[in-house]
Structure formats: C-alpha cells, structure tokens
Swiss-Prot record:
This is Pantothenate synthetase. Catalyzes the condensation of pantoate with beta-alanine in an ATP-dependent reaction via a pantoyl-adenylate intermediate. It catalyses: (R)-pantoate + beta-alanine + ATP = (R)-pantothenate + AMP + diphosphate + H(+). The reaction proceeds by a bi uni uni bi ping pong mechanism. Beta-alanine binds at Q60. It is an enzyme of class 6 (ligase). The lineage of its organism: Bacteria, Pseudomonadati, Pseudomonadota, Gammaproteobacteria, Legionellales. Pfam families: Pantoate_ligase. It comes from Coxiella burnetii (strain Dugway 5J108-111).
C-alpha cells in the first residue's frame, strides 16, 4: 500500500526504519505520464523500496506564467502511484522544502550553454531542490530521464562533487508513436500545436544538418532557441506557440553539424 507523506519529519522517522534496504528514488513535479512510470518501474526492479516525490519546484521556473500554468494533478498522481505499487510518495509544501526561503542555493558557475543560456537561474533551482531531496530521501539510486540530458549531467556532477552516496541513473527517453518525447507540457498543446510538435520531432530526427533543421523548423512556424551538437549528441529547444519543447538524440560521429 502506498503511503503518502507531506510532513518531512514523518519521512525522516520512516527513513530510519529502512536503513538496511535499497531505496530507489524518482523525483518529479507531478503530472505523471508513461515516461515517469518507466522510471518508477526500473526503480522497482532494482530496489526493495521505491520513493516518488511530487513537488512543483518554484525556484526552477524563470517564467512566472510557466509556473502558474504547470498542471497540478496531485490526486491523479497519487492514484497512479498506488496503481503502480509505489511504496512512498513525498508531497511536501513549498515552505517545508524551503524553510530558508531559498536563501541557500546550489549553483554551477561554469555552465552557460543550451538551457542555462535560455533559462537563466533555472539550474540553480534544479540543483538546489535535487540536493535537498537527495539529502532527505538518502536513496541508493535516483532515476532521471535523458530528455533533460543537460540536467542529468549536472545532477551526476552534483552527486560526485558533494560525495553523495547515491548512484544517479539516466534512463532512455520514452517517446510517442511519432517520436515526440513524452512531457507534461505536451498536454497543454492544442490540436494544431500537437501536429506542429510532431513536425518538430520528424524534422529534428532527420538526417539534415543543424542549420538545415533550423531553417526547416522556421518555415513551419516554429520558433527555435537552439539546434546544436555537443558531446556526440544533438540537442534542440523550440517553441510551439507558447509551449517550449526540448529533445536530444545521440548521433554518429560523421553526422555532426
């Protein structure tokens, strides 16, 4: 039976009772979909206990409207956790997780490309909340999707830099039948925007060069933040209407921009 915990002191008491067990952790902002469920299933396969967090982290939004419009589906998410046999759900309040009112934060002073360039201070909020959650949950393993690939690499660096006793595991992107990565943002797309998002995915996954992809997307009416190759992967961030979508794929060495 899934136990839902709001008070962090309650969780801290519970955590002491499972010290001898392996604990898998999947941090999310809720609005769960099949991509999240794939992370949870892997955790269940590899650990005795699986913990899911549901927390819409205000400090990682550099756009107030984006935070305001983020889907809030707590009851639905808890029901999905119960259906999928998750042991514990952490659902803390903002004040509980930020008793310091965000006076203390984790930052990476060297990152300035891709999401760091287009979403100022975003990763400060991400790294800070991840650090708080990892210290609270003390997981054996924590699972992150590769859709947010830059975030995944930063979290791995965070765990290494601060000697956290947690293995950070990246999991493959879950896509729909058109190749579009599953994302909570997809649910905000109108029917016409969804068709355009599918075109983004088709063009991005083509054999075109970065510049050719940019031009093709612009011709479709899609606003491009970046299409670039970095460390043997191709990355994209675009706007379909007011919805921002990201994707990344590994590529062959002879197909760089």
């Amino acid at each position: 039976m899934t136990k839902v915990i709001e008070a962090l002191s309650d969780w801290q008491s519970i955590r002491k009772t499972i010290n001898d067990l392996s604990v898998g952790f999947v941090p999310t902002m809720g609005n769960l979909h099949a991509g999240h469920l794939s992370l949870l299933e892997r955790s269940k396969c590899e650990n005795t206990i699986t913990v899911l967090s549901l927390f819409i982290n205000p400090t990682q939004f550099n756009n107030k409207n984006d935070f305001k419009n983020y889907p809030r589906t707590l009851a639905q998410d808890i029901a999905m956790a119960e259906e999928n046999g998750i042991d514990y759900v952490l659902a803390p309040t903002d004040d509980a997780l930020y008793p310091d009112q965000y006076a203390y934060k984790i930052t990476n002073s060297t990152i300035n490309n891709q999401e760091a360039e287009f979403r100022p201070r975003h990763f400060d909020g991400v790294l800070t909340v991840v650090m708080k959650l990892l210290l609270l949950v003390k997981p054996t393993r924590a699972y992150f999707g590769e859709k947010d690939y830059q975030q995944l690499q930063l979290v791995k660096g965070l765990a290494e830099a601060f000697f956290l006793d947690t293995e950070i595991i990246g999991c493959k992107i879950v896509r729909n039948e058109f190749g579009l990565p599953l994302s909570s943002r997809n649910r905000r797309l109108t029917e016409d925007q969804y068709q355009l998002a599918q075109r983004f995915s088709e063009i991005f996954h083509s054999d075109l060069s970065c510049d050719e992809i940019k031009n093709a997307l612009i011709q479709e009416g899609i606003i491009v933040d970046y299409i670039e190759d970095y460390n043997e992967r191709r990355f994209a961030a675009v706007h379909v209407g007011d919805i921002r979508l990201i994707d990344n794929i590994p590529f062959a060495k002879d197909k760089k921009c």
